[in-house]
């Protein structure tokens, strides 16, 4: 999400929220300045009240003039018929910019917040790692967070990668160009039942150089 330095009125997430016909709650923060004028950050829009919010840097750099400075926002909310969930909205660096340390800090933070009182913990956003790449394989090796779009759209590949720990992850995902993901803590009590792409030429139209991903969940109690 971007906003000009003058403040929240120019924040892209707020502009989107203000145009929606229903009321949505917004949590947003920014990581660094892009092109020396835009506050580049992250956001969460929710139909449900926030029970808790937090934000913090997961990068070593906290210099607002450095593109390697990366902050994450976190919200906890109660979803009817499912329970409380934690959502972390992230935009991490490329491998060369510190992805590994940023992801390690993010998952440690998320794991610290996770507990039996939660139905799920989600790590969502632009991770700047291609599906099947070295960075993606690091997520798989953590054995903590799993790709929910893949679980819903390709159960066979999901099973081989996340359950059987296949050594050929890059082969299973050779045609998968995603760098944006919805990872769920594997001990969560929800399951992905459907998924689709958004913000394509056929679904709502393009809004950026990224595609959106929508995943539907049900309890698996």
Regions found by a protein language model. Name each.
Residues 1-86, 194-197:
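Structured beta-strand-rich core segments of catalytic domains in phosphoester-bond hydrolases
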Residues 7-8, 38-41, 100-101, 134-137, ...:
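Short aromatic-enriched loop/helix-cap "lid" or pocket-rim segments at secondary-structure transitions
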Residues 25-27, 88, 122, 149:
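Structural detector of well-ordered beta-strand residues that form the stable sheet scaffold
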Residues 2-5, 34-37, 95-98, 128-134, ...:
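Active-site environment of divalent metal-dependent phosphoester hydrolases
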Residues 111-122, 129-221:
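Metal-dependent phosphoester-hydrolase catalytic domains
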Residues 79, 91, 217-219:
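Short beta-strand segments enriched in hydrophobic/aromatic residues
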Residues 71-88, 98-137:
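His/acidic metal-ligating clusters that form di-metal
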Residues 8-12, 67-70, 98-105, 131, ...:
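Soluble or luminal CAZymes and related metallo-dependent hydrolases
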């Amino acid at each position: 999400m971007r906003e000009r330095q003058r403040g929240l009125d120019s924040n892209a997430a707020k502009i989107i929220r203000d145009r929606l016909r229903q009321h949505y709650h917004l949590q947003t923060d920014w990581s660094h300045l892009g092109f020396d004028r835009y506050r580049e950050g992250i956001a969460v829009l929710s139909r449900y009240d926030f029970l808790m919010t937090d934000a913090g840097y997961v990068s070593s750099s906290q210099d607002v003039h450095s593109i390697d400075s990366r902050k994450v926002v976190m919200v906890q909310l109660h979803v009817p018929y499912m329970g409380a969930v934690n959502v972390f909205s992230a935009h991490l660096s490329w491998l060369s910019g510190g992805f590994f340390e940023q992801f390690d800090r993010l998952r440690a933070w998320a794991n610290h917040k996770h507990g039996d009182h939660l139905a799920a913990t989600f790590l969502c956003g632009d991770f700047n790692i291609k599906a099947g790449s070295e960075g993606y394989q690091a997520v798989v090796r953590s054995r903590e967070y799993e790709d929910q779009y893949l679980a819903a759209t390709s159960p066979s590949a999901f099973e081989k990668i996340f359950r059987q720990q296949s050594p050929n992850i890059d082969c299973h995902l050779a045609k998968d160009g995603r760098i944006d993901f919805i990872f769920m803590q594997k001990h969560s009590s929800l399951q992905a039942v459907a998924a689709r792409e958004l913000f394509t030429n056929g679904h709502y139209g393009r809004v950026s150089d990224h595609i959106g991903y929508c995943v539907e969940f049900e309890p698996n109690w």
